[in-house]
Amino acid sequence: MEDKEELRKLLRSMMRKSTDPRTKMQDEYLTDEDKAIQRSERPPAKKRACKDCTCGLKEEQEVRTRSACGNCYKGDAFRCSGCPSLGLPPYEPGDVVSFSMDLSNEFQGEDA
């Protein structure tokens, strides 16, 4: 009876193992340290201010919105991913760029 159980264990272990000779050769060169899975540590998630922020986080984030690359004025092709001017057209250094959100005046002249 013990022989049958040993035979079953042996067959199960053989079924689990890969019979591909390439993987067998690759495993020979790996050490235990290589086989250990290393988890990459993620940076902590950034806190976002809520819509009706009362703790001051919204104001703090507005102050921090500055570009680290210094290429804001050149255009989107030269801007970094965290650039506050991302999506805006190129401008001269030192100029203040602002857009009117009221588009109704622009379209009224075309209809009249």
UniProtKB/Swiss-Prot annotation:
PANTHER family given in the database record: ANAMORSIN
Segments traversing the membrane: none
Entry's Gene Ontology BP terms: iron-sulfur cluster assembly
CC terms in the record's Gene Ontology section: mitochondrial intermembrane space
Species, as recorded: Encephalitozoon cuniculi (strain GB-M1)
Keyword Methyltransferase attributed: no
Family: Belongs to the anamorsin family.
Swiss-Prot/TrEMBL keywords: 4Fe-4S, Cytoplasm, Iron, Iron-sulfur, Metal-binding, Mitochondrion
Function: Component of the cytosolic iron-sulfur (Fe-S) protein assembly (CIA) machinery required for the maturation of extramitochondrial Fe-S proteins. Part of an electron transfer chain functioning in an early step of cytosolic Fe-S biogenesis, facilitating the de novo assembly of a [4Fe-4S] cluster on the scaffold complex CFD1-NBP35. Electrons are transferred to DRE2 from NADPH via the FAD- and FMN-containing protein TAH18.
Quaternary structure (record): Monomer. Interacts with TAH18. Interacts with MIA40.
A Pfam entry, by short name: CIAPIN1
Gene of this entry: DRE2
Compartments, record wording: Cytoplasm; Mitochondrion intermembrane space
Region (Fe-S binding site B): 69-83
Chain positions covered by the region annotation Disordered: 8-112
Identification of the protein by name: Fe-S cluster assembly protein DRE2
The keyword Manganese appears for this protein: no
Entry domain remark: The C-terminal domain binds 1 Fe-S cluster but is otherwise mostly in an intrinsically disordered conformation.
Cofactor requirement: [4Fe-4S] cluster
Residue ranges annotated as motif Cx2C motif 2: 80-83
Short motif (Cx2C motif 1): ranges: 69-72
Signal peptide positions on this chain: none
GO molecular function, one term: metal ion binding
Residues reported in the UniProt entry to bind [4Fe-4S] cluster: C69, C72, C80, C83
